[in-house]
């Protein structure tokens, strides 16, 4: 098997193992990969892969600390349009809530603030991956929601 094909198989197996959310140590991941036929895998390589794919330790349903991949649709690249950073847009009677890729909320909020009151935006509050935005006078929350959907080419 070609080296790149073998590497792709390793990455696929690695991600599948992390999705199981049952491995609490790098050694356990090494052992599981070796059982699948990846004989040249070691703790150092697993550590680099965990870092490369942004794996984190979190509690699973059994309250055990395990490695898993973050719930992110994709890591943005330099050629990604900003709209790819917006994952979901919803609203209630008071605010429009925008969910973004981790770390992208402040960038998107800055863009919305720059559009300002002319587009119906009174202001925004951004965390790491969530934005609250409220409509300016003369605009309803639904108007603002629809304007933001259109801005990011989202479906109703």
Curated annotation (Swiss-Prot):
GO terms for cellular component: cytoplasm; transcription regulator complex. Its main location: cytoplasm. Keywords: Amino-acid biosynthesis, Arginine biosynthesis, Cytoplasm, DNA recombination, DNA-binding, Repressor, Transcription, Transcription regulation. Changing residue 21 to K: Increased affinity for ARG box in the presence of arginine. Changing residue 47 to L: Defective binding to ARG box. It holds the Pfam family Arg_repressor_C. One of its GO terms (molecular function) is DNA-binding transcription factor activity. It is found in: Cytoplasm. Pathway: Amino-acid biosynthesis; L-arginine biosynthesis [regulation]. InterPro entries: Arg_repress, Arg_repress_C, Arg_repress_C_sf, Arg_repress_DNA-bd, WH-like_DNA-bd_sf, WH_DNA-bd_sf. Belongs to the ArgR family. Homohexamer. This is Arginine repressor.
